[in-house]
C-alpha cells in the first residue's frame, strides 16, 4: 500500500468502525480488478484484486445466511428456505447493504470504471461486499461477521419471507409512473462507451419524453435495470 491507499483504508475503518489487524486484507478487499490491472501494468506487483476474496466471501455469505434461516425459521420448508437464501444473498441485497455502509466511496477502481459509474454499480458493490466478508472472516473470524451484520440480514430475510422485499425496479417504476402519468416509462439506448476494451451501454429512462434517470451497464439489460433503480429511488425521495 502506498500512502494515499493507506489513507483510504484508514478512513474506511474510522467511518465504519470495522478495524483490521491486517490492513492489507482490507486493502485487497477494496481493490477492483480494473485498479489492480492498472497498477500491475504500471509496474506494481503488490496490488492484487479482490476476486479471490470474493470467491471465499461467497461461501462465507452462504453459510451466514443459511445459519440465520436454520435458526429463525425451523418450521419452514426446505424449498422456501432455498428461495429466501437466494434472494437474501442476491446482488440487489448486497448492493443495498453496501450503500448503507457507503462502501462504494472507499473502492479502488480503474479510471475506466470510475468514469462509467462503477462506484455505484450493483455488481461491483455486491462483489466488494463479499470480498469484505472474506477479509473480516480471515482477520477476525466468523463470529465478527455475525456481530456486524446479523441484525441487518435478519431484517432483509424477514421482509423476503413476508413477500415485502422488492427487487424488480423496472416493474416498481412502471407501477408508479403509470399510476401518476397513465403511460409506461420508456428505455432508450442513447450511446455506447468503451471501458478498457469493453462496451458500456448507456440507457435513459423517460416519461412523456422527459429523461428522469440514466443508467450504465455492460449489457443493455443491466443499464436499463440501473436506470430504473435510480429513477425509482428518485421518485420515492420526491414523494417523501
UniProtKB/Swiss-Prot annotation:
Mg(2+) binds at residues 54, 127, 130. Belongs to the ribonuclease III family. This is Ribonuclease 3. PANTHER family: RIBONUCLEASE 3, RIBONUCLEASE III. GO terms for biological process: mRNA processing; regulation of gene expression; RNA processing; rRNA processing; tRNA processing. It comes from the Bacteria. The active site is at residues 58, 130. Residues 168-237 form the DRBM domain. It is an enzyme of class 3 (hydrolase). Digests double-stranded RNA. Involved in the processing of primary rRNA transcript to yield the immediate precursors to the large and small rRNAs (23S and 16S). Also processes some mRNAs, and tRNAs when they are encoded in the rRNA operon. Probably processes pre-crRNA and tracrRNA of type II CRISPR loci if present in the organism. The gene is rnc. Homodimer. SUPFAM superfamilies: dsRNA-binding domain-like, RNase III domain-like. Optimum temperature is 40-70 degrees Celsius. Its cofactor is Mg(2+). The keyword Nucleotide-binding does not apply. Its EC number is 3.1.26.3.
Amino acid at each position: 500500500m502506498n500512502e494515499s491507499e493507506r489513507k483510504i483504508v484508514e478512513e474506511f475503518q474510522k467511518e465504519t468502525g470495522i478495524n483490521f489487524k491486517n490492513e492489507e486484507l482490507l486493502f485487497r478487499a477494496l481493490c477492483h480488478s480494473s485498479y489492480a490491472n492498472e497498477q500491475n501494468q504500471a509496474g506494481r506487483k503488490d496490488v492484487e484484486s479482490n476476486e479471490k476474496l470474493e470467491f471465499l466471501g461467497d461461501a462465507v455469505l452462504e453459510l451466514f445466511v443459511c445459519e440465520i434461516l436454520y435458526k429463525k425459521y425451523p418450521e419452514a420448508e426446505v424449498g422456501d428456505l432455498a428461495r429466501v437464501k437466494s434472494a437474501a444473498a442476491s446482488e440487489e441485497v448486497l448492493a443495498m447493504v453496501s450503500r448503507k455502509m457507503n462502501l462504494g466511496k472507499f473502492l479502488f477502481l480503474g479510471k475506466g470504471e470510475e468514469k462509467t459509474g462503477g462506484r455505484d454499480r450493483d455488481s461491483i458493490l455486491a462483489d466488494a461486499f463479499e470480498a469484505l466478508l472474506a477479509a473480516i472472516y480471515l482477520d477476525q473470524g466468523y463470529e465478527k461477521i455475525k456481530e456486524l451484520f446479523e441484525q441487518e440480514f435478519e431484517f432483509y430475510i424477514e421482509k423476503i419471507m413476508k413477500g415485502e422485499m422488492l427487487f424488480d425496479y423496472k416493474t416498481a417504476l412502471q407501477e408508479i409512473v403509470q399510476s401518476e402519468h397513465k403511460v409506461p416509462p420508456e428505455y432508450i439506448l442513447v450511446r455506447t462507451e468503451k471501458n478498457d476494451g469493453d462496451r458500456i451501454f448507456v440507457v435513459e429512462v423517460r416519461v412523456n419524453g422527459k429523461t428522469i434517470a440514466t443508467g450504465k451497464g455492460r449489457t443493455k439489460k443491466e443499464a436499463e435495470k440501473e436506470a430504473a433503480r435510480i429513477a425509482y429511488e428518485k421518485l420515492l425521495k420526491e414523494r417523501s
